[in-house]
């Protein structure tokens, strides 16, 4: 049976609909950085997602080819994730999506070294005739966070974020978004196939102790 990160690491991918604190270890990702409204048709974000999956599935299916990755095991490609911020804003402003900066990313299995990653990018670029020059091997060290499962439309996330901030404050923590630790979302539902009110999104915010 294929290894499924969502099932094996439920604390990171299947949290309750109530906020919780947790320590998130460093993880490696295939990532693309960009700017602008993620909903823009044929926009930068949609192109980035195509790049991510091209590399992710090249790695996943590599065992069927001549290039054998040491330590490979069959696995389910982890869900799409995103880091989001806006210049001059301490919190995400959903009313002005055109000002978003983002890092779209998919978690990599532990056996994917930088060398194997570079092979996969070159292989995907050649096979699919894509420009993958924006794709990068990205290590994200998230640390202590407040996390919650958000159920519903992305535009209703502020209510969940308010609950997370209140939960943290009651425990003498504050939201601590910086250039190194950002608003983080993990997308468990495909919005093209799921009713908006049923979409599941894991939301994380970095926190630190109030001095």
Specify the residue positions occupied by each region the protein language model found.
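A solvent-exposed interaction/effector surface
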Residues: 1-211
């Amino acid at each position: 049976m294929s290894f499924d990160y969502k099932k094996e690491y439920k604390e990171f991918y299947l949290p309750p609909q109530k906020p919780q604190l947790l320590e998130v270890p460093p993880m490696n990702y295939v990532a693309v950085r960009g700017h602008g409204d993620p909903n823009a048709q044929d926009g930068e974000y949609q192109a980035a997602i195509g790049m991510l999956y091209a590399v992710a599935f090249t790695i996943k299916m590599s065992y069927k080819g001549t290039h054998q990755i040491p330590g490979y095991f069959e696995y389910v490609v982890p869900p799409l994730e995103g880091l989001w911020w806006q210049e001059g804003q301490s919190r995400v402003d959903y009313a002005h999506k055109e000002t978003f900066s983002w890092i779209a990313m998919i978690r990599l299995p532990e056996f994917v070294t930088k060398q194997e990653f570079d092979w996969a990018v070159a292989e995907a670029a050649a096979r699919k005739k894509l420009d993958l020059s924006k794709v990068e091997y990205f290590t994200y060290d998230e640390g202590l966070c407040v996390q919650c499962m958000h159920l519903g439309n992305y535009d209703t996330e502020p209510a969940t974020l308010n609950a997370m901030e209140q939960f943290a404050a009651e425990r003498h923590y504050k939201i601590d978004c910086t250039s190194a630790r950002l608003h983080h979302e993990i997308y468990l539902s495909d919005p093209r196939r799921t009713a908006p009110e049923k979409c599941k999104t894991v939301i994380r915010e970095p926190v630190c102790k109030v001095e």
